[in-house]
Amino acid sequence: MQKRAIYPGTFDPITNGHIDIVTRATQMFDHVILAIAASPSKKPMFTLEERVALTQQATAHLGNVEVVGFSDLMANFARNQHATVLIRGLRAVADFEYEMQLAHMNRHLMPELESVFLMPSKEWSFISSSLVKEVARHQGDVTHFLPENVHQALVAKLA
């Protein structure tokens, strides 16, 4: 039986830090579902459809990745996808407390769902979508932090 994992997030937009995590996850699991949350409360810059399309393009080189949008409760989504592993990236100690709370709640809702925490490579450890957007809004060069297609879309969105 295949080991299916979900890597959820808002990915507004997906960064090279996210690509780093999902690339390493593909080496650990047979099938990785990159699950893009609708997250209307976060008021994303890109629509869910745009985020899905950008992420599909940015991960096209990864053969065992499926990109899908979702708006369901994570535990329900994982159950429907027959996934038993939830991948989460941890950049800093500050991320840990929140992620621990999520992991405990997800385990309560779906006991067979295991949370696996991956640290990004040092090069990406300080990057977040929010930070990249903020720097780009002020005409800072964020080319290094985004896949090329995502960088082009961000520049167009801010124009």
Curated annotation (Swiss-Prot):
Keywords: ATP-binding, Coenzyme A biosynthesis, Cytoplasm, Magnesium, Nucleotide-binding, Nucleotidyltransferase, Transferase. GO terms for cellular component: cytoplasm. One of its GO terms (molecular function) is ATP binding. Its EC number is 2.7.7.3. Pathway: Cofactor biosynthesis; coenzyme A biosynthesis; CoA from (R)-pantothenate: step 4/5. Reversibly transfers an adenylyl group from ATP to 4'-phosphopantetheine, yielding dephospho-CoA (dPCoA) and pyrophosphate. HAMAP family: PPAT_bact. This is Phosphopantetheine adenylyltransferase. It comes from Shigella sonnei (strain Ss046).
